[in-house]
Amino acid sequence: MTEVPWVEKYRPRKLSEIVNQEKALEQVRAWVEAWLHGNPPKKKALLLAGPPGVGKTTTVYALANEYGFEVIELNASDERTYEKIERYVQAAYTMDILGKRRKLIFLDEADNIEPSGAREIAKLIDKARNPIIMSANHYWEVPREIRNKAQIVEYKRLTQRDIIKALVRILKREGLEVPKEVLYEIAKRANGDLRAAVNDLQTVVTGGVEDAVEVLAYRDTEKSVFQALAQLFATDNAKRAKLAVLGVDMMPNELLQWIDENVPYVYYRPEDIARAYEALSRADIYLGRAQRTGNYGLWKYATDMMTAGVAVAGIKKKGFVKIYPPKTIKLLTESKEERSLRDSVIKKIMSEMHMAKLEAIETLRYLRVIFENNPDLAAHFVVFLDLSEKEVEFITGDKEKAKTIWAKSMNIEKKLKKEGELEARAKEAERRVEAAEEEETMEAGEPEEELEEVEEEELTEEELEEAEEEIETVGKKEKPEKEKTKKGKQATLFDFLKK
């Protein structure tokens, strides 16, 4: 029996082979043929939206096979920066001029595109000379700048009947038989995901139909990598360790990074840690060979080494072990809400502490340590930076600690508010005293003005005439003296000294 994954071996090569998506495929054909006839559609991008495992990626490659396109695939969760995306797209344009085959640009996981890159990708769509197809689980999570420029084609979730038919066709081509109840159980657990169902079918056949119930018991399409690793590290049984990761929708190289990150938290003896990393090293070698040679049958051996090999490496720590995401891909796995909270905290640090962005990012790392170890000091930072409760939880990474810090910050704010109210009252009292003193001063000054006015009113006409005559007499005496001074010789410094 071949080791090639059945999802690749039996991937449809024609659009007509895709399971129960006729309406969606009709729209896709019309859109592509408009490009081929030299009349590109008004919306130059196509957005395929629907649940996992319904045929979105398969549509792209079947389309390329039928119409002779060369696919240039990008993954939004891996190539998030605009510079990388632009480099690939510009390369596609260049190859279009020099090469003979037309290019089809495929952007997978478009709902994971960074907002900063979305605007630039929208510009690339505007000037596109080749068809651009994107895929997403939820079209409303695709950035608006891109979504508005794309024709949306919705794929429906497959029924259990659809999945069973597809599984039966594969079994016939393999010359195998599986009990109906097992097929029904696979279809039920797949929850509309044909890719997951095919993987389960191959696992059941490889492990033996008699173990099908045990194998399927581990299958959970919604299982997170945290749950899978918790099961993996909790057992020292090789078979259970391999079954633990069946429900994780993740490539082997990604899973390797997760396991690699958590080995030191699970094992405490140096020799056990060394054995675990030796198993991971062998897994990495198999993955590298599979990538270079295209022999993806090596994935099975890589998975065995990174699961069973690690699980039986030695004695594990007792009690609960927290699972940590890999540092190298942590930023890529953050949810949109987490990225938004992170950016918000960084902006507040930049504003309140007058820092550049890189300094603020570095400061955030120190804040995490403070929030982890010193709730009292952390509470003061919450007030100083005006952090929200969600931002506190983001920095802390622990809901219980976040609640404690938030409660302390509320007490500080109440205290500051009370002090502020007292200060405001004191200032108001001071203002009132000053106003009262000013009013008293004004009232004391009014009689003097009245007195002056009375004195001016008491002058008689005779006194006014005498004053005028006196002014005229003084003026006549001063005038000749001024004229005499003008006619005299100009005094010099020598004359002044002679005197």
Swiss-Prot record:
Single GO BP term: DNA replication
State a single Gene Ontology molecular function.
DNA clamp loader activity
Question: Which keywords are on file for this protein?
Answer: ATP-binding, DNA replication, Nucleotide-binding
Q: Which InterPro entries match?
A: AAA+_ATPase, ATPase_AAA_core, P-loop_NTPase, Rep_factor-C_lsu, RFC_lid
Highest taxon of source:
Archaea
Q: What spans are recorded as compositionally biased (Acidic residues)?
A: 436-472
Is ATP-binding a UniProt keyword of this protein? Answer: yes
> Which residues are ATP-binding?
G50, P51, P52, G53, V54, G55, K56, T57
Q: Where is this region: Disordered?
A: 428-499
Provide ranges: composition bias, Basic and acidic residues: 473-484
Tell me, what does this protein do in biology?
A: Part of the RFC clamp loader complex which loads the PCNA sliding clamp onto DNA.
UniProt lists the family membership as follows:
Belongs to the activator 1 small subunits family. RfcL subfamily.
Q: How does it assemble?
A: Heteromultimer composed of small subunits (RfcS) and large subunits (RfcL).
**Could you tell me what this protein is called?**
Replication factor C large subunit
Source organism: Thermococcus kodakarensis (strain ATCC BAA-918 / JCM 12380 / KOD1)
Show the taxonomic lineage. Answer: Archaea, Methanobacteriati, Methanobacteriota, Thermococci, Thermococcales
